Amino acid sequence: MPYPRRVIIYLREKGIPSSLVTIVRVSDPNNGDAAPPEYPPRPAGSLPILAIPPAAHSGSQTYIYIRQSNAIMTYLDELCDEGRDGFPLSKHLMRGTDPLSRARDIELLALADECTTAWNPVRTFGTGAGTLSLPAAAKEMIRWVYRALATIESWWADRDFSSLRRGANGQVSMAEVVLYQFLDFTKDCYGVDITQGSGQTVKDVYGREVVERYTKVREFYEAFRTRDSARRDAAAGEVPPEAALKLMTTWAEGVL
């Protein structure tokens, strides 16, 4: 699931220990969609959900829930930036250090989220994991993913990503976590390296001629994937089961 994974990557990048934020693995929706008995019942809503215990908020008698991945990361990030409630003080700021850098991070975050949202109809109409086979619709929607990637590509024309590689001590932003999660999701779960454009000149969704090539986005992806935070822990349920992978990687003819 893409949205819980971005939070997992964020927690690793931030160095937030499991003693402060415990990841609770729920059962498959077809098998109860429930949390283990030692934890509170799974609240309603799509995952991830951050359950804040009553003790963390004076006057509250019940759990407080945050039900959106970006909101969860922002909440935790502010706790770390302020060193509140026992959270480790941020070693670097993941949402920018001044008004301009914060605006840039929001720009990238919006496009990364747009990619993830646009992918839903691509996989729904174009793969065996979907509920309705409409290859033409899936093919059209993937062009909107390319539109967002093309914009990001233009922003990064002069950027060097070597510092993001494991051991190079480079830091990532929250928006970069979200973008990497999308690129990782399409590659590892759907077998599509979305950064590999055709290299051909095509018309985008607005009828403009563009070169379908995302060299800098690919450089970013290759650098980030070497980081410890990007690993997938099969024992923790971060790798889809074989049956699900088979459906996700079964593409209708003509989509790709």
Language-model features, listed with the residues they occupy:
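Short, thiol/selenol-centered motifs that function as redox-active sites or metal-ligating centers
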Residues: 1-11, 176-177, 188, 227
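GST-like domain detector, emphasizing the conserved glutathione-binding G-site
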Residues: 2-139
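Structured alpha-helical bundle/scaffold domains in large eukaryotic membrane-trafficking regulators
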Residues: 8, 194-198, 236
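Acidic carboxylate-rich catalytic motifs and surrounding loops in phosphoryl-/glycosyl-chemistry enzymes
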Residues: 25, 231-243
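Eukaryotic N-terminal low-complexity, Ser/Thr- and Lys/Arg-rich leader segments
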Residues: 82-85, 232, 245-256
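Short, hydrophobic secondary-structure boundary micro-motifs
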Residues: 85-96, 163-166, 232-236
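Amphipathic alpha-helical surface "interface" segments used
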Residues: 97-105, 240-254
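GST-like fold's C-terminal all-alpha helical module
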Residues: 100, 104-226
